[in-house]
Amino acid sequence: MPELPEVETVRRGLLPVLQGAVIESAEARRPDLRWPLPEGFAERLTGRRVEAVGRRAKYLLADLDGGEVLIVHLGMSGSIRIEGAQVKGRPAGFYHPRGEPGTHDHVVFHLAGGATVTFNDPRRFGAMLLVPYDQLDSHPLLSSLGPEPLGNTFHADYLAQACAGRRTNLKAALLDQKVVAGLGNIYVSEALHRAGLSPRRMASTLASASGAPNVRTERLVTAIRDVLREAIQAGGSSLKDHRQVNGELGYFQHNFKVYDREGEPCPTLRCKGHVQRIVQAGRSTFFCATCQR
């Protein structure tokens, strides 16, 4: 499933084409995604101008001039591509034509000026919803989300307070979207390795008895931020389905230190351990038991 860096990469690719554009028409070729498309979906989008393209956690948000917000979730295998766009400052071949419509092209937006934005989702776990702007923050998908890990409200003091007294392991705490929004299996494994913290460690050890942060908390916040920024810069991680809107792959997977590196020597300087794989809550976790404590 795309995590924060992959969704942010898509958002940045959409921004120069979609923001300010008018949707001349919309096609709903397959209305039964993870949830049925909203009633009158295509009609409600036709003629609308996209005022802003944002992101919250793993959700894309397109603010429309009619007072609604289009929420897009890529699901397990969803991707968005742009065709027919000319973007200032981009090489002419940046947005690649794809020819005939794909079997799994479920929603297509035709923009004024000739560009198209297509949502492709082979497994149909993705979703598109229309929500009134003034109800966005209270929507069930968004209302309980924790802070953005790259935002100003995510810091050591917050994380220590969020983890104080929690009777769960550190990995489970970081995957809890109520604690911090947008993290998933890949980037939690990578951040914990950078911070030198075991995924088995109790989350409560990030806080002192008074709930104050400690050196482990500071290291972890820094590691999370650094890993996410580097992954976004690399266009995300393409393991199976993720592609940027121009069809190109992300390449952060080439920079993984532990994720999907089972049996390989730990890359930490002077560490003689090897990367292990364990299963936590049904998900694979990769870490080095020698240097992650």
Curated annotation (Swiss-Prot):
The keyword Metal-binding applies. Keywords: DNA damage, DNA repair, DNA-binding, Glycosidase, Hydrolase, Lyase, Metal-binding, Multifunctional enzyme, Zinc, Zinc-finger. A zinc finger (FPG-type) spans 257-293. It holds the Pfam family zf-FPG_IleRS. Its cofactor is Zn(2+). Signal peptide: none annotated. This is Formamidopyrimidine-DNA glycosylase. GO terms for biological process: base-excision repair. HAMAP family: Fapy_DNA_glycosyl (MF_00103). It comes from Azorhizobium caulinodans (strain ATCC 43989 / DSM 5975 / JCM 20966 / LMG 6465 / NBRC 14845 / NCIMB 13405 / ORS 571). DNA binds at H104, R123, R166. Binds 1 zinc ion per subunit. It catalyses: Hydrolysis of DNA containing ring-opened 7-methylguanine residues, releasing 2,6-diamino-4-hydroxy-5-(N-methyl)formamidopyrimidine; 2'-deoxyribonucleotide-(2'-deoxyribose 5'-phosphate)-2'-deoxyribonucleotide-DNA = a 3'-end 2'-deoxyribonucleotide-(2,3-dehydro-2,3-deoxyribose 5'-phosphate)-DNA + a 5'-end 5'-phospho-2'-deoxyribonucleoside-DNA + H(+). Involved in base excision repair of DNA damaged by oxidation or by mutagenic agents. Acts as a DNA glycosylase that recognizes and removes damaged bases. Has a preference for oxidized purines, such as 7,8-dihydro-8-oxoguanine (8-oxoG). Has AP (apurinic/apyrimidinic) lyase activity and introduces nicks in the DNA strand. Cleaves the DNA backbone by beta-delta elimination to generate a single-strand break at the site of the removed base with both 3'- and 5'-phosphates. InterPro entries: DNA_glyclase/AP_lyase_DNA-bd (IPR015886), DNA_glyclase_Znf_dom_DNA_BS (IPR015887), Formamido-pyr_DNA_Glyclase (IPR020629), FPG_cat (IPR012319), MutM-like_N-ter (IPR035937), Ribosomal_uS13-like_H2TH (IPR010979), Znf_DNA_glyclase/AP_lyase (IPR000214), Znf_FPG/IleRS (IPR010663). Its EC number is 3.2.2.23, 4.2.99.18. The active site is at P2 (schiff-base intermediate with dna), E3 (proton donor), K58 (proton donor), R283 (proton donor). Belongs to the FPG family. Monomer. The keyword Iron-sulfur does not apply. GO terms for molecular function: 8-oxo-7,8-dihydroguanine DNA N-glycosylase activity; class I DNA-(apurinic or apyrimidinic site) endonuclease activity; damaged DNA binding; zinc ion binding.
